[in-house]
Amino acid sequence: MSAAPHASPTTIACLLGPTASGKTAAALALAARRPIEIVSVDSALVYRDMDIGTAKPSRDERASVPHHLIDIIDPADAYSAASFRADTLRLIGEIAARGRTPLLAGGTMLYYKALTQGLNDLPGADPDVRATLDAEAERDGWPALHARLAQVDPDTAARLAPNDSQRIQRALEVFMLSGQPMSVLLAAPRRTDDAAAAYRFVPVALEPSDRAVLHKRIAQRFDAMLDAGFIDEVERLRRREDLHPDLPSMRCVGYRQAWEFLDGDTDYRTMRDKGIFATRQLCKRQITWLRAMPERIVVDCIAPDSTARALDALERVLDGSTPG
C-alpha cells in the first residue's frame, strides 16, 4: 500500500511594508473584495491605550473587517516574537475554520521571520536580570553597559549604539542567562517545528521607488499625530506609576521622544525632529529586511495607484497565480 500523498501547503498572503507605506488602505481594499480577517504583524499595535502614536486602525476600520493581535496586552507587559508566532499560527487555523481568509499585514519583520523561519534558541526575558541591568544603567549609564557587552559579545556590541538601551539590555541578559554571546546563538540553526509547514507564506512588499517621498509622508503623519493629541496620549501613560521609559512599549518610535519632551529634556521642536528621524530610521531598517526576501512581490508604495497594485498582487497570490 502506497503512502498517502502530502497535502499541498495552504498559501497565506502577507502584506508587508515600512511605516506610512499604505498597508492599511491595501488591506481594507482586499476586505471589500473577499471575506478576510487581518492578523496584525506589528509589535506596537499589541498595546492597549497606545492608539495615536502607533497609527492604530480606527474603530470604523476595525469594525469593517475583523482584526487580530491589536490591543491584546497592557503597556506594562511584554510580547515576544515567540508569542506572536504561536498566536498567529493558532489564528490562521481559526480563521480558516470560519470559512474566511487570513491576511497577515504589518511591518515588524522580526515577527515575520520568526513565523516563517522558526525561532532561535534564545532564553526568555527574566525580570530579575532586567531589573539588575536597569539599576546598573541608572548608576553607570548605558555606555558603560555597552562597554561591558563589548567584552563578552564584541560582534553584537559593534552593531549597537552605546545608548541603545533595549538591545544592549537584551544582549547582556542573553549572555547572563545562557553563558553564550547572543551573536553565537543567533548564528546557530533555527529551531523549527511542523506548525508552520502546512503554510506557504507569500510576502507582498510595499516599497518606495523614491525614499524621499516616503520620508515626506512620515513627517506629515507625525505632524498629524501631534495634531490629533499624541502628547496628551503619552502624558496619560506617563501618569501611571507602573510605566517608565525603558519598557518595550515606551520604547516604541515616537513615545520615547514624547516622554523626553514631557520630562523637560527636550523642547517641542527637538521632540518633533527626533520623532521624525527615529521613524525614518525604522523605515530604513524595515526596507533592509524586505530586500533580504528574494521571494517577495514588490509594489511601489508611492505610485499613484499603489493601493490598486497591491490589491492586484494580493488577489493573484490568493488565486494561486504566482510562482510557487
UniProtKB/Swiss-Prot annotation:
Q: Where is this region: Interaction with substrate tRNA?
A: 42-45, 166-170, 251-256, 284-291
User: What EC number(s) is this enzyme filed under?
Assistant: 2.5.1.75
Q: Record's Pfam families?
A: IPPT
Where does the entry annotate site (Interaction with substrate tRNA)? Answer: 108, 130
User: Which top-rank group of organisms is this from?
Assistant: Bacteria
What SUPFAM superfamilies is this protein classified in?
Answer: P-loop containing nucleoside triphosphate hydrolases
Q: What class of enzyme is it?
A: transferase
Cofactors needed by this protein, per the record, are: Mg(2+)
What are the binding positions for ATP in this chain? Answer: 17-24
What's its catalytic activity? adenosine(37) in tRNA + dimethylallyl diphosphate = N(6)-dimethylallyladenosine(37) in tRNA + diphosphate
Is Magnesium among this UniProt entry's keywords?
A: yes
Q: Name one GO molecular function term.
A: tRNA dimethylallyltransferase activity
Which positions are tagged coiled coil? none
Question: Which processes are annotated in GO (biological process)?
Answer: tRNA modification
- What are the binding positions for substrate in this chain? 19-24
Keywords in alphabetical order, please.
Answer: ATP-binding, Magnesium, Nucleotide-binding, Transferase, tRNA processing
Q: Could you describe the subunit structure of this protein?
A: Monomer.
Question: Would you identify the family this protein belongs to, as annotated?
Answer: Belongs to the IPP transferase family.
Summarizing the function annotation, the protein's role is:
Catalyzes the transfer of a dimethylallyl group onto the adenine at position 37 in tRNAs that read codons beginning with uridine, leading to the formation of N6-(dimethylallyl)adenosine (i(6)A).
Name recorded for this polypeptide = tRNA dimethylallyltransferase
Gene of origin?
miaA
